[in-house]
């Protein structure tokens, strides 16, 4: 109705239940909320009630268009604990090196479990460029046993996807 993203439980249920009944797809649901709206933690974490295999874990705040996509440390702490409690694997979304470092520090403190799964978001105007050099730089900083995938934004989609496949990573497709 509003054409905005939502964390509405009933709307998620209308989508998740038929997908679960009719397929064996791996579900990755978002805890990202909506940039600029600063939803309460409990609202952002509603999708974890559906026990998806993966859920987004944006490892820091970032400018997003004309708004700030806010992921302060207190939210990251709550989200990480809830994901462990729910048995949901965090899809650690990394828009820049600082987010990877945040996730690594949380792993050292036991807040994120190993092996970690990193999703490198490349080519946004406010984050890491969608270049082979930028991807290699990010990969140098994560543990070798980590799984990782790439999403290239705009023009970087195809080159980043091909690079990930060549290097043994994964690519992200689908809707958000």
Model-based region annotation:
Residues 6-23, 43-54, 105-118, 172:
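Short, electropositive alpha-helical surface patch
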Residues 1-2, 30, 103, 164:
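Histidine-centered divalent-metal-coordination microenvironment in nucleic-acid enzymes
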Residues 3-6, 38-39, 102:
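Short Asp/Glu-rich motifs
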Residues 29-38, 96-99:
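Short, glycine/charge-rich beta-strand/loop segments that flank catalytic centers
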Residues 38-48, 157-161:
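Short, acidic/polar
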Residues 1, 27-31, 92-93, 173:
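Short beta-strand segments at enzyme active-site cores
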Residues 54-175:
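Catalytic alpha/beta core domains of metabolic enzymes, predominantly
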Residues 3-31, 78-85, 137-145:
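Alpha-helix-loop-beta-strand connector modules within alpha/beta enzyme cores
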